[in-house]
Amino acid sequence: MPRSLKKGPFVDDHLEKKVAYALENKDRRVIKTWSRRSMILPEMVGLTFAVHNGKKFIPVFVSENMVGHKLGEFAPTRTFHGHAADKKSKVKK
């Protein structure tokens, strides 16, 4: 269920301060964050975030069509290594 419109979008305070600082000073350095739950706002377009996926930081460049989504959606936490091969078929050959 989506968030109520009267509440507005959620962005962690510390992340909001970093974004405001970057916009004021025209600073285009990567903003490192653990806040996967923060929503991407229109003023974040053009900035690059390093979003933590539980192991390392994944660089995410924010474009216009990402507005309204959360930062964590663009930094996957699980890696798929493929299913195990069938051992019986290897033995017959």
From Swiss-Prot:
Q: Which SUPFAM superfamilies match?
A: Ribosomal protein S19
> What keywords appear on the UniProt entry?
Ribonucleoprotein, Ribosomal protein, RNA-binding, rRNA-binding
Q: Which InterPro entries match?
A: Ribosomal_uS19, Ribosomal_uS19_bac-type, Ribosomal_uS19_CS, Ribosomal_uS19_SF
Stretches assigned to coiled coil: none
A GO CC term attached to the entry: cytoplasm
Q: Per the UniProt entry, what are the Gene Ontology biological process annotations, in alphabetical order?
A: ribosomal small subunit assembly; translation
Q: Which GO terms describe its molecular function?
A: rRNA binding; structural constituent of ribosome
Q: Which Pfam families does the record cross-reference, listed alphabetically? A: Ribosomal_S19
Q: What is the disulfide pattern of this chain? A: none
Q: What does this protein do?
A: Protein S19 forms a complex with S13 that binds strongly to the 16S ribosomal RNA.
Q: Which PANTHER family match?
A: RIBOSOMAL PROTEIN S19P FAMILY MEMBER, SMALL RIBOSOMAL SUBUNIT PROTEIN US19M
Q: Which NCBIfam families match?
A: rpsS_bact
Q: Which family does it belong to?
A: Belongs to the universal ribosomal protein uS19 family.
- This chain's protein is named Small ribosomal subunit protein uS19
- The organism named in the record is Solidesulfovibrio magneticus (strain ATCC 700980 / DSM 13731 / RS-1) (Desulfovibrio magneticus)
